[in-house]
Amino acid sequence: MDWIEEAKKIGFSGAAVMDTSKLVFVPEYRRFCEENLCGCYHVNPACPPQSGTVEEMDRRARSYEKTLVLQTIRDGSTDPRKDKLQQNKMTEQLAEKMKAAGMGDLLIMSAGPYKHHSCMSAYCVNAQKMADAAGMICWNDDDKMRFF
């Protein structure tokens, strides 16, 4: 099945497959979790420190050869919390289709902590470099919000 096309059918604005080796992990990003702006640090098991050390999460992600990057682009006037939730629900929907097709071993990095999935901040992934490697735009001088 073409997972990029399937992702777009579900409602993602963009999707791309990239080599996981091209993901850039920045251990210093862990401080964003430690600042606890989302209120999940030391509370949600999908979040640090319960989710694992930076090194453990790096190894977990790198154990996969390929990464399916999913992007949602929204108008800047929408509620980012609702947009992240929608991104996560669509990701979950696509993951269920992938599992039904026999792809049982999936690692989901969510847009913010979601259920038992850790977010990209917890994994310390550089979203800009990931977007570049996937041929997507992360930040732009427009009124759009982009979620991965």
Segments from the language model and where they lie:
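Auxiliary alpha/beta "docking" domains used to position bulky ligands
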Residues: 1-148
